[in-house]
Curated annotation (Swiss-Prot):
PROSITE patterns: HTH_TETR_1, HTH_TETR_2. Pfam families: TetR_C_6 (PF13977), TetR_N (PF00440). The lineage of its organism: Bacteria, Pseudomonadati, Pseudomonadota, Gammaproteobacteria, Enterobacterales. The keyword Metal-binding does not apply. It comes from Escherichia coli (strain K12). This is HTH-type transcriptional regulator BetI. Induction: Negatively autoregulated. Residues 8-68 form the HTH tetR-type domain. BetI is an unusual repressor because it remains bound to DNA during induction. Repressor involved in the biosynthesis of the osmoprotectant glycine betaine. It represses transcription of the choline transporter BetT and the genes of BetAB involved in the synthesis of glycine betaine.
Length: 195
């Protein structure tokens, strides 16, 4: 008889082991056996909880996107009366949260983006994540700008966030959060009306 609560513990172990494997050997070279060994479980446990490697990869990406959503929402909830500028910076901060810029998370995101072009479920996850970012940004810009300008500014800031993140991921160095925050703050203030 399974122990109560073991499913969530096992799932967490396997997702963490998947991130470690992707960080070390990449998504394509990470095998079920390697992941199971890292998690200290049998390969049958992976099949039991996730069907196969693709199911585990999907769960891992859902976990990372959930962490991203939580990082953004936690910052926004802390600013219920915040200005558009403050709330936009909160969204930026959530996207540059440690859960999103650790070496393992960055490599997983890169592999996820590449795989999403060929796997429909990963593509849907990628689209949801991308639309959520754009929607959040446009919504905040819309507080101060006409719809069309808010959409342009939101699209531009999303591209800047993704570009800064991608440059850091491909450099193999940690994201320079000070520089990233400075550049995004400059973009935001350029697009919002002055008092």
């Amino acid at each position: 008889m399974p122990k109560l609560g073991m499913q969530s513990i096992r799932r967490r172990q396997l997702i963490d082991a998947t991130l470690e494997a992707i960080n070390e050997v990449g998504m394509h070279d990470a095998t079920i056996a390697q992941i199971a060994r890292r998690a200290g479980v049998s390969t049958g446990i992976i099949s039991h909880y996730f069907r196969d490697k693709n199911g585990l990869l999907e769960a891992t990406m859902r976990d990372i996107t959930s962490q991203l959503r939580d990082a953004v929402l936690n910052r926004l909830h802390a600013l219920p009366q915040g200005s558009a500028e403050q709330r936009l910076q909160a969204i930026v901060g959530g996207n540059f949260d440690e859960t999103q810029v650790s070496s393992a998370a960055m490599k997983a995101w890169l592999a996820f983006w590449a795989s999403s072009m060929h796997q429909p479920m990963l593509y849907r996850l990628q689209q949801v994540s991308s639309r959520r970012l754009l929607s959040n940004l446009v919504s905040e810009f819309r507080r101060e700008l006409p719809r069309e300008q808010a959409q342009e500014a939101g699209y531009g800031l999303a591209a800047l966030i993704d570009g800064l993140w991608l440059r850091a991921a491909l450099s193999g160095k940690p994201l320079d959060k000070t520089r990233a925050n400075s550049l995004t703050r400059h973009f935001i203030t350029q697009h919002l009306p002055t008092d």
